[in-house]
């Protein structure tokens, strides 16, 4: 039996403590008057929005600690996946603290902080596919200029987020006029479609262009399909929230309703993404024993 060096044992034991301390330091370094907000100052949709910002911050932080603690419980080939999972929710927790502060102090559901978060975390979510299934299951299909599967996922995510931001901040109104919000939504959907075409859909309606399903380990098949379900079904919540964004001029603007939809979508998709990947990694690790 292989002997694990004592320093590596120490690192494994200290990782959870370091994770907790890191999250605590981040919280203290961003402390503001938002810490002392009184929930009694809110009612109705405003109260729900305030509540979900708080729950979002705490749940993302808890998920970060969980994924860091579980990283060494899976085989080495799946630890990158666990690292990505931790990064996604850790970065989200940091931004949710800021978004909660902006709402408490200024009454604003911040679009800018939201997209700062998405610009980092959504590409990481898309890259979860190649990190989980491994190089052996990735096809040789390429898109000219863009490249292979990982590049398509990355490009599609950035394209989607970029056009969404343009639509929600009114950047394209001078170019597209009153239809800017709708056109940006449609253009953003192109990036979403790219990821689905590359990674596949959960219903087996089309063969994925970037993944060879026959080469994916049996233990990972359920998790892979669950990730596809999040992409195809779970992400539908985001364009619904976009419709209520005040700057898009699509439906009657309601920043609280938009914020609630986005917060719920983030908690479901970001935490859920990591959980199903962890389940697959644990199952595949057990099969290797």
Task: Give short role names for the model-derived ranges.
Residues 197-202, 226-289:
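C-terminal transmembrane-bundle signature of multipass membrane proteins
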Residues 144-147, 180-185, 202-233, 255:
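Membrane-helix boundary/juxtamembrane motif in polytopic membrane proteins
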Residues 34-60:
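Hydrophobic transmembrane alpha-helical segments in integral membrane proteins
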Residues 62-67, 128, 163, 190-218, ...:
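Alpha-helical transmembrane segments in multipass membrane proteins, preferentially the mid-helix core
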Residues 1-33:
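N-terminal secretory/membrane targeting signals
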Residues 84-102:
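A generic, lipid-embedded transmembrane alpha helix
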Residues 64-70, 96-100, 104-106, 115-152, ...:
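Internal transmembrane alpha-helix with an interfacial aromatic "cap," most often the third helix
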Residues 12-15, 74-86, 144-150, 224-227, ...:
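Membrane-interfacial loop-to-transmembrane alpha-helix junctions, especially the N-terminal start
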């Amino acid at each position: 039996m292989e002997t694990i060096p004592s320093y590596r044992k120490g690192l494994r034991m200290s990782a959870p403590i370091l994770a907790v301390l890191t999250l605590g330091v981040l919280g203290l370094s961003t402390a503001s008057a938002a810490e002392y907000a009184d929930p009694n100052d809110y009612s109705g949709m405003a109260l729900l929005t305030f509540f979900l910002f708080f729950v979002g911050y705490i749940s993302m932080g808890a998920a970060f600690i969980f994924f860091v603690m579980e990283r060494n419980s899976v085989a080495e080939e799946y630890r990158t996946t666990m690292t990505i999972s931790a990064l996604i929710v850790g970065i989200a927790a940091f931004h949710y603290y800021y978004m909660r502060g902006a709402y408490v102090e200024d009454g604003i559901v911040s679009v800018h902080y939201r997209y700062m978060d998405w610009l980092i975390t959504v590409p990481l979510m898309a890259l979860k596919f190649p990190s989980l299934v491994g190089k052996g299951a990735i096809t040789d299909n390429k898109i000219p200029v863009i490249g292979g599967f990982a590049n398509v996922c990355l490009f599609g995510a950035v394209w989607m987020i970029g056009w969404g931001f343009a639509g929600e901040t009114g950047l394209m109104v001078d170019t597209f006029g009153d239809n800017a919000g709708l056109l940006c939504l449609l253009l953003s959907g192109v990036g979403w479609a790219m990821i689905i075409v590359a990674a596949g859909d959960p219903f087996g309606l089309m063969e994925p262009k970037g993944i060879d399903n026959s080469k994916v380990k049996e233990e990972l098949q359920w998790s892979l399909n669950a990730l596809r379900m999040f992409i195809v079904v779970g992400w539908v919540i985001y364009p619904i929230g976009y419709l209520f964004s005040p700057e898009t001029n699509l439906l009657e603007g309601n920043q609280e309703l938009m914020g609630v939809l986005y917060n719920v979508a983030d908690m479901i998709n970001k935490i859920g993404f990591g959980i199903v990947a962890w389940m697959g990694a644990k199952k595949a690790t057990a099969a290797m024993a």
